Amino acid sequence: MKKYTYKKYIQTMMLAVAVIPFFSSCDYLDKEPDDMLTIDAVFDNADYTKQWLAGVYNLVPDPLWEYMNFAGYGYYMMSDETQMASSLGQFGWGNLMNVQQGSWTPTQIIPGKNLWKETYQKVRSGLIFLERVKEIPDQRQTVELVERYKNEVRFLIAYYYSRMLEVYGPFPLITSLMDVNDSGEVLKKERTPYDEIVNYLDNEFMELSKILPSSYDNVNIGRPTSGACLALRARMLMFAASPLFNGNEDFKDVVNKDGTPLFSQSKDNKKWEKAAVAAKLVID
């Protein structure tokens, strides 16, 4: 009898041990997967908010292998002085062959990336962030931190657009969220004239240079600084003042469908003065 009772006790305990994990996992199973979170749930949580911000940062290029180098090999690969054997294509140099053979397309500016498409994706993500991010006191997301986040995103949007301007010239400048349910006429925005884009980015960089810090501690290194704003602004204004974009008659026929010219045909020497002042501001 005692042996039977002991055996029954052991069986009962084993069943209990087997069932406990099932009940303890109920809360876990009730949780919504990260990839199924609503946008409200994201911005109600400080950690998810930071993850969204990190996603906006995601298009910032590697300075060695991407932005400073064309196709990872240097802008000089587009020059007439550079030649290569077709047999080198098997070693990953195929992109350079595309350049030399005239089969290079705007979507191949950066290998493995579609800069045009990805820029608009990140800009939209940034605009959503600016609209949704908020203070969460019980999660230590303060008003001050929210403002810092917003300024970082504003910089990133301006920075991404400055890259677009450098690579493509005029493009549709979108500064507010567009509703996907809008009509095709609204969504198919025409390209914005070059000088209009420059003026917008000029104002953004200048304003942010007065807000963003000059440096960060090691924990936050890599975030945008006032110096970065001034440097990008000076570089952009220098190109805008150059003969390439300042009254270049070669672009006189580059217009939108409604006839709006995308490049000014009037040479303006004041652009050089503005560029010089901007460069001096960086040095000082």
Regions found by a protein language model. Name each.
Residues 1-34:
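Bacterial Sec-dependent N-terminal signal peptides
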Residues 26-77, 254-255:
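Membrane-proximal, proline-rich intrinsically disordered regions
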Residues 45, 50, 58-68, 88-168, ...:
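Conserved, well-structured interaction surfaces
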Residues 165-166, 172, 239-248:
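Short coil/turn linking the two alpha-helices of tandem helical-hairpin repeats
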Residues 222-232, 236:
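Amphipathic alpha-helical protein-interaction segments enriched in hydrophobic
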Residues 239-241, 270-284:
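Polar, glycine-rich mid-to-C-terminal structural blocks
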Residues 247-267:
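A solvent-exposed, charged loop/short amphipathic helix patch at secondary-structure junctions
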